[in-house]
């Protein structure tokens, strides 16, 4: 047990003094004494007994996890550093949507490496997320300005999935009745790969051809690339107009850096613009994570995927920000949702937005102009040397006819430290980026045998005015809002970042007990490797011999995950939990199709399921059939059996979460899986609650055929304020041949019998650069630590449930009165009696310095608490004290001491303006100011002040405004 030691360390053996398990005691919050205290409180003599009372014996593992023992932090870092050293860093000129960039140090240190930014949750509780929301609004404004469209969302997962979302959005809003979607053949190949996967599942017909031929197509929509993958810049205005005249919806995939200079997609008439924001300060990271941008016309807002930040007002009339139009999202509309996307890429979107804030419009124009100038110099030098370089307009990318010298030149550039793109046996591609230097261009020209001097070439290019005709340059102002024209010194930027951070509550302040979200410790030692150059600066399509370290780390992590889940194969490609669901269901569908069972399209989903489940099933072309739950929160076995029998001939899958979203280990889970299997279906296990399984049971042991793992929950990747996430899937052997592959780069398993399965994400290993976080966590915890983490997560949840049960009914428990790793408190009786709702309790918790638990999921009118294993007894007791004090405040309403509409809950959260009565009014509420803002003695010691009062959600949805507001509005 961590933290236990003999009376004198001088008497301890060396094996103990080595402290190889020290990290376990850093990660698991309660020490041995606190564990004993909590066990006594819940009436269990030891952890083993508690687990026996909680987890059904039929699904328990028969042996410990087949993993090594724990490693000390320094040793795990050294081991991973040795693996990373096997990667070879080259100056990348591959392009294809991934480019070198300089992350400003002030953003790297104060955002990317700052737990105040990376440990926050998605900003559902907007009053304590105003800093992040302002940053995202800046990002949206940046995208709006550069794309020339009216509305942008707060990011999608990557450019390729954004293109797939554009295709499905086009189908929703297009007037054309065609089933054809036209794709510019000069789109990036990874985008085409993802489009093929999505279109096949929806039954869309893809038609490929040159962009200029799109106007002749009878299609419901089209995707055009600008600049295209060959680097060409073509004015698409006429093509767009012709397509729209036929009732088609037109999407343009573009490049934000190019759009600093180029005519915008909106100006050319596009309905949708999308692409990657990666080159705005986010490292390539072997494929991700990066924020994809997505913009459209305001008329399409209700059909747009992803989250949107909008402007509203608070109870004092002050400008306040929130996520707007949430009724579009999967957690509300389920199988009718626009998309299954839940987690997106908030941390990376914020970094890209801050990149624009820091550089401003003039700085960005200088960066973009420099990139173009270097590309133009390179083109001119190559032409002068006799190479055939296409004469059309370009921004940063050239495709050079190298003929029989292609292999020789590629090898020479490799030896000199450059990666070029081998387009074919006779053509090489070169993409210039922010990190390219004049010396690089001079070296490349020398390698190609060109003799021109850089200065002379520069003068020649300058006299010609570059390689972009005036008609293709933008003539409108961009980024005119003051936020993009103020913070250009490091002092000002640093203070702006700190001001925003101070408005947000993250794990660096207090526990975040969101049920089904697993907001556990994101240890510093786990985070350190993601900024190592060996992981951060590799292109996802770099030659395989240069990425041996990445492949070894990924293979090692896959081995860890196989041990934890019991599955035969792991696919790392899905870059969110929802994408994992999608990838797993795709594998199931293709498995059935391979057996001739193309009619198996029914997916059974319990009523309690997360909204992504039905949304993902719908995306895979499956028909969702809902299974009822009984009064104990379990799957209703009679209803399941009836529906399994009813749909036996068409049954494709059951999607089920375990432990259930009701926070209990269902004892009939094996029977449920067996019933589905008997009728020809497959079992998809949602891995949202895997944190209650690790080391005790596993998806494969339970009977699942495929499951995703939320690495941003169970395996310590931080939530980033709403992303990044990773959702790799584990598959049984019979499904392994049907997991995603990739058209550009191998996914690591060269022996799979089935090829051409298609991609679900842009990069072969998804957001590869954050995988070291999970590798470090598992390496440092080892077999014993992972099991202890699960046991303590269950103990902490039972302790919270036990302490709060006399104040709030615990809605569901197992047969022996235990909950799993989370518990649901029923607020409905309180609301019926007083009008005080779960929302009021959530807002009041802000006054105590806590983020609310999950509200109204999976049962309306409830709150779901998941404390995780990382919170110690002191923090649990503070949260419990806050909840009990709030219940006593509710009793004051129940007994008539406070009005139902004027009490600390209905008026929560309280701000500094409330406390000091800034408007000069006297305090006139029936409770004291101290009760409002310092309700318990310890609150004042570390007070978190919400920066706004309760936000008016209805006003925000009815008065849609999703761009930056005047600066003075923030002070109103």
From Swiss-Prot:
TM region(s), chain numbering: none
Cellular component aspect of the GO annotation: cytosol; glycine cleavage complex
Record key words, sorted: Oxidoreductase, Pyridoxal phosphate
Names of required cofactors: pyridoxal 5'-phosphate
InterPro entries referenced in this protein's UniProt entry, alphabetically: GcvP (IPR003437), GDC-P_C (IPR049316), GDC-P_N (IPR049315), GDC_P (IPR020581), PyrdxlP-dep_Trfase (IPR015424), PyrdxlP-dep_Trfase_major (IPR015421), PyrdxlP-dep_Trfase_small (IPR015422)
GO biological process terms held by the UniProt record: glycine decarboxylation via glycine cleavage system
PTM-bearing positions, type N6-(pyridoxal phosphate)lysine: 713
Reaction catalysis annotation: N(6)-[(R)-lipoyl]-L-lysyl-[glycine-cleavage complex H protein] + glycine + H(+) = N(6)-[(R)-S(8)-aminomethyldihydrolipoyl]-L-lysyl-[glycine-cleavage complex H protein] + CO2
Entry's EC annotation: 1.4.4.2
UniProt GO molecular function: glycine binding; glycine dehydrogenase (decarboxylating) activity; pyridoxal phosphate binding
Pfam entry (one): GcvP2_C
EC class of the enzyme, as a word: oxidoreductase
Stored PANTHER family: GLYCINE DEHYDROGENASE (DECARBOXYLATING), GLYCINE DEHYDROGENASE, DECARBOXYLATING
Family label: Belongs to the GcvP family.
Role played: The glycine cleavage system catalyzes the degradation of glycine. The P protein binds the alpha-amino group of glycine through its pyridoxal phosphate cofactor; CO(2) is released and the remaining methylamine moiety is then transferred to the lipoamide cofactor of the H protein.
Complex formation: The glycine cleavage system is composed of four proteins: P, T, L and H.
UniProt-recorded name of the protein: Glycine dehydrogenase (decarboxylating)
Source species of the chain: Aromatoleum aromaticum (strain DSM 19018 / LMG 30748 / EbN1) (Azoarcus sp. (strain EbN1))
């Amino acid at each position: 047990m961590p933290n236990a030691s003999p009376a004198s360390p001088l008497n301890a053996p060396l094996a103990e003094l080595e402290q190889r398990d020290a990290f376990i005691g850093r990660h698991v919050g309660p020490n041995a004494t606190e564990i004993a205290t909590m066990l006594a409180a819940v009436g269990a003599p030891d952890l083993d007994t508690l687990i026996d009372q909680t987890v059904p014996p039929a699904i328990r593992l028969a042996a410990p996890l087949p993993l090594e023992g724990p490693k000390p932090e320094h040793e795990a870092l050294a081991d991973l550093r040795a693996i990373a050293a096997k990667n070879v860093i080259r100056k990348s000129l591959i392009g294809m949507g991934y480019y070198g960039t300089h992350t400003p140090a002030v953003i790297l240190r104060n955002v990317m490496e700052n737990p105040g930014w990376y440990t926050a949750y998605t900003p559902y509780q907007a009053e304590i997320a105003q800093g992040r929301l302002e940053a995202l609004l800046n990002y949206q404004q940046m995208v709006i300005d550069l794309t020339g469209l009216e509305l942008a969302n707060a990011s999608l997962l990557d450019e390729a999935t954004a293109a797939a979302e554009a295709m499905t959005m086009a189908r929703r809003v297009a007037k054309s009745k065609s089933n054809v979607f036209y794709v510019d053949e000069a789109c990036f190949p990874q985008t085409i790969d993802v489009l093929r996967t999505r279109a096949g599942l929806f039954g869309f017909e893809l038609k490929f051809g040159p962009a200029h031929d799109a106007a002749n197509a009878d299609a419901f929509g089209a995707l055009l690339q600008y600049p295209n993958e060959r680097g060409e810049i073509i004015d698409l205005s006429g093509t767009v107009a012709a397509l729209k005249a036929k009732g088609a919806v037109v999407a343009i995939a573009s490049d934000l850096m190019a759009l600093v200079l180029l005519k915008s997609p909106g100006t050319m008439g596009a309905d949708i613009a999308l692409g990657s924001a990666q080159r705005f300060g986010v490292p390539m990271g072997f494929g991700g994570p990066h924020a994809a941008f997505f913009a459209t016309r305001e008329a399409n807002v209700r059909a747009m995927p992803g989250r949107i930040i909008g402007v509203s007002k608070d109870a004092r009339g002050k400008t306040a920000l929130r996520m707007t139009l949430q009724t579009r999202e999967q957690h509300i509309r389920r199988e009718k949702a626009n998309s299954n996307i839940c987690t997106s890429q908030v941390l990376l979107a914020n970094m890209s937005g801050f990149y624009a804030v820091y550089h401003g419009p003039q700085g960005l124009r200088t960066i973009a102009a420099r990139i173009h100038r270097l590309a133009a110099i390179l083109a001119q030098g190559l032409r002068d040397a006799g190479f055939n370089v296409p004469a059309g307009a370009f921004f940063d990318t050239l495709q050079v006819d190298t003929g029989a010298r292609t292999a020789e030149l590629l090898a020479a550039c490799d030896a000199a430290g450059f990666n070029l793109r081998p387009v074919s046996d006779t053509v090489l591609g070169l993409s210039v980026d922010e990190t390219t230097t004049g010396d690089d261009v001079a070296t490349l020209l020398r390698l190609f045998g060109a003799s021109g001097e850089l200065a002379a070439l520069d003068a020649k290019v300058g006299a010609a005015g570059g390689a972009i005709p005036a008609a293709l340059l933008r003539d409108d102002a961009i980024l005119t809002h003051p936020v993009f024209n103020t913070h250009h010194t490091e002092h000002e930027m640093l203070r702006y970042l700190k001001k925003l951070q101070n408005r947000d509550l993250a794990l660096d302040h207090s526990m975040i007990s969101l049920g089904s979200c697993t907001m556990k410790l994101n240890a510093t030692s786990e985070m350190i490797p993601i900024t190592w150059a060996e992981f951060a600066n590799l292109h996802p399509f770099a030659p395989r011999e240069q990425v041996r370290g990445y492949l070894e780390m990924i293979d090692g992590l896959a081995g860890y995950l196989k041990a934890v889940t019991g599955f035969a194969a792991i696919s790392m490609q899905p870059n969110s939990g929802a994408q994992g669901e999608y990838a797993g269901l795709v594998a199931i569908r293709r498995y059935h199709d391979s057996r001739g069972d193309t009619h198996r399209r029914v997916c059974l989903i319990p009523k309690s399921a997360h909204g992504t489940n039905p949304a993902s099933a719908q995306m895979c072309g499956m028909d969702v059939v809902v299974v009822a739950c009984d009064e104990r929160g379990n799957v209703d076995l009679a209803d399941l059996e009836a529906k399994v029998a009813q749909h036996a001939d068409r049954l494709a899958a059951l999607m089920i979460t375990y432990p259930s979203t009701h926070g209990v280990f269902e004892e009939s889970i094996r029977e449920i899986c067996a019933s589905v299997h008997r009728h020809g279906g497959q079992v998809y296990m949602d891995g949202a609650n895997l944190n209650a399984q690790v080391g005790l049971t596993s998806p494969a042991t339970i009977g699942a055929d495929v499951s995703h793992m939320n690495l941003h929950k169970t395996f310590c990747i931080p939530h980033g304020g709403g992303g990044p996430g990773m959702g790799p899937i584990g598959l049984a052997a019979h499904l392994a041949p049907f997991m995603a592959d990739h058209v550009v780069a191998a996914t690591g398993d060269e022996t799979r019998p089935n090829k051409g399965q298609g991609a679900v994400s842009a990069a072969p290993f998804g957001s590869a650069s954050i995988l070291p976080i999970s590798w470090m966590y598992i390496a440092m915890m080892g077999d014993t630590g992972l099991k202890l983490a699960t046991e303590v997560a269950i103990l902490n949840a039972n302790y919270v449930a036990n302490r709060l049960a006399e104040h709030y009914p615990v809605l569901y428990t197992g047969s022996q009165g235990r909950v799993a790793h989370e518990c649901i408190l029923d607020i409905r009786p309180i609301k019926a009696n007083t009008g005080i709702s779960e929302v009021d309790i959530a807002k009041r918790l802000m006054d105590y310095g806590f983020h609310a638990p999950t509200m109204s999921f999976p049962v309306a009118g409830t709150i779901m608490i998941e404390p995780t294993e990382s919170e110690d007894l002191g923090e649990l007791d503070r949260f419990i004290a806050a909840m009990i004090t709030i219940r006593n405040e509710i009793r004051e309403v129940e007994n008539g001491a406070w009005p139902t509409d004027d009490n600390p809950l209905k008026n929560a959260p309280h701000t500094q303006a409330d406390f000091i009565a800034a408007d000069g009014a006297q305090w006139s509420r029936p409770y004291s100011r101290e009760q409002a803002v310092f309700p318990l003695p310890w609150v004042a010691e570390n007070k978190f002040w919400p920066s706004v009062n309760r936000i008016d959600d209805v006003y925000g949805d009815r008065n849609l405004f999703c761009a930056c507001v005047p600066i003075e509005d923030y002070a109103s």
